[in-house]
Amino acid sequence: MSAPRTCASFLTSLPVLGAVLGTLAAWADCRGAENEGLTATSPLTFTLPANDGKPYALAQHKGQVVMIVNTASKCGFTKQYAGLERIYKKYQTQGFVIIGVPANNFGGQEPGSDADIATFCTKNYGVTFPLMAKAEVAGSAKIPLYTYLTEKSPKTGGIKWNFTKFLIGRDGQVVERFGSMEDPESPEVTATIEKLLAMPVPAPAKP
């Protein structure tokens, strides 16, 4: 009788295994571009797999103000999705974008697949800002983007929890970092966004 149960368990696990393999494949597709960022001069050098597995070049946001935030669906700060979506809609037309990077590093609070995460964010918070594939954002296995962010931010050091927010100015440099406790709609965050949006877009570098 043990064999049928074993087979059933295996078959049940196939969708989960497929989701995991899909995420790994998506990251493998982007690894070359990630490695190019070892000598990066901006976080916008990096290419990540988006939530749908397609490569997402952060370079498309050159000249914009970018917030990169690691997210989780089962965290005490998950409700910040609502505020993030509101500021995204408020400032989007002025050249502001949010990049969500789901991660399971802290408390195992993002256990789902990329499809699960997309459904959760859309259903519960109406999220429309770009979401990336689930990634490692802390520890020795963290993706190169997060190595760059944590080393080049004015406040250096590894991130401690979900919903840490990095702000990148129109010049492509990391200019501010806000922790989990800082609400995305707080005066400190919105004032910084508005200050960065008021700055001119740098002229393209001469060939």
In which residue ranges do the predicted regions lie?
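N-terminal secretory signal peptides that target proteins for export/translocation
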Residues: M1-F10
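Bacterial N-terminal signal peptides
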Residues: T12-A26
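N-terminal "domain-start" segment that seeds a small globular fold
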Residues: D29-A59, P144
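Proline/glycine-enriched tight loop/beta-turn segments at coil->beta junctions
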Residues: H61-V65
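Amphipathic alpha-helical repeat scaffolds
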Residues: N70-K74
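Structural microenvironment flanking redox-active thiols in thiol-disulfide oxidoreductases
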Residues: F77-K142
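Thiol-/selenol-based redox modules, centered on thioredoxin-like
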Residues: P144-P207
